Amino acid sequence: MIRIKDIPQVALRTALFALLKDGQSCDVFGDVPERAALPYITLGAMTFRPVGNKTAVIWQATAGIEVWADGNQQQEMNDILNDICVLFSYYGADLEIEGYHIIGTELESVETWPESVTGYHGTVTVQFTLQKGKVQQ
C-alpha cells in the first residue's frame, strides 16, 4: 500500500470555488455573511475515498454544490442548478487541482426540495477521480 500524505480537499474546494465564481452571476460563498441576499451558492459536503494502488495515490472524491433560494425563487434556483451542470460538463475535467491530475469526472446527481428556513434548496453532486502528481503520458 502506498502512503497517503495529503487529502485533496482544499485543492478541490479551491478549484470548484474558482469555477463557480467565474461562471455564475449569483454570489458564491465559502462562509455565508449574516444577511446574504438569496439566491446564492455554497460548497457543501465532500467525501474522499482512497482507491490507489501500490504505485499511485488515487482518490475518488464527491463534492456537493448547494444552491439556496427564497420561497419566490424556485425558477431561479432551477436555472442556477442547470448552469452549474453545464459549467461542470464543459469545464469540470479541465479544472486545475493543485498537486493532482483529474482522471475522470461525473455529474452524479441533482436534487431539489423545499427548505423551511430559506424557501428552496438544491444540490448538484459531482464526482472526481484524482491522481496525485502528474500522470505520465
Where are these regions (language model features)?
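Charged, amphipathic alpha-helical segments and their flanking helix caps
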Residues: 1-31, 45-137
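Low-complexity, acidic Ser/Thr/Pro/Gly-rich terminal tails and inter-domain linkers that flank the onset
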Residues: 38-46
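Short, charge-patterned binding micro-sites
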Residues: 34-35
